[in-house]
């Protein structure tokens, strides 16, 4: 197989984004990379209005770590993309939306670009240098992208609906 510029382009998008998302999950799950681990993440989730903060923090960490791994490997790409969209939409709405767009002010720029990239990846597919392609189960196209977006936004809406509605917080600048 001859590796093309397109193969390399999608690989260069997938791997760093997936690994960085795994890192965010590891911060929540294990306290690695300067993260707070389950205790501090649970406290943050409670401050953001989520019930059972520790459990919700573990779910967010697992979502980020698992989706990040899937994105990096190009495995179960539409499902991995949906998981990334779910976690990043929750982060954008619960922790960043009130701070505006730009990341330097704690805004939702970073989760927005990751979620949009995930939707784009679901449309484009993970490319030939992926687990999906190696297993012959690559799923891509507009229908798969829209399905990932719908599943991701639906999952986010379900989790966001659990939050306490009258909670006002002063969350850390980089909680997710």
Model-derived regions, located:
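Extended, low-polarity transmembrane helix blocks
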Residues: 1-28, 76-176
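Amphipathic alpha-helical interaction elements
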Residues: 30, 71-74
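Phenylalanine-focused residue identity feature
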Residues: 30-33, 65, 108
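Solvent-exposed, well-ordered loop and adjacent helix/strand elements within mature globular domains
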Residues: 20, 24-60
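Hydrophobic, membrane-inserted alpha-helices
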Residues: 63-71, 95-96
């Amino acid at each position: 197989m001859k590796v093309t510029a397109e193969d390399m382009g999608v690989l260069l998008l997938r791997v760093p984004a997936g690994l960085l998302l795994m890192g965010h999950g590891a911060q929540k799950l294990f306290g690695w990379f300067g993260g707070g681990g389950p205790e501090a993440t649970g406290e943050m989730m409670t401050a953001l209005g989520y019930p059972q903060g520790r459990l919700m923090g573990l779910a967010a960490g697992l979502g980020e770590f698992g989706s990040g791994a899937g994105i990096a490997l190009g495995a179960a790409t539409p499902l991995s993309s949906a998981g990334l969209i779910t976690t990043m939409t929750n982060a954008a709405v619960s922790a960043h939306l009130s701070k505006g767009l730009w990341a330097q002010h704690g805004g939702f720029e970073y989760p927005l670009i990751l979620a949009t990239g995930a939707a784009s990846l679901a449309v484009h597919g993970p490319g030939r240098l992926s687990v999906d392609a190696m297993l012959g189960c690559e799923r891509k196209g507009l229908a798969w992208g829209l399905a990932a977006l719908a599943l991701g936004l639906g999952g986010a809406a379900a989790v966001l609906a659990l939050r306490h509605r009258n909670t006002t917080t002063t969350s850390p600048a980089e909680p997710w």
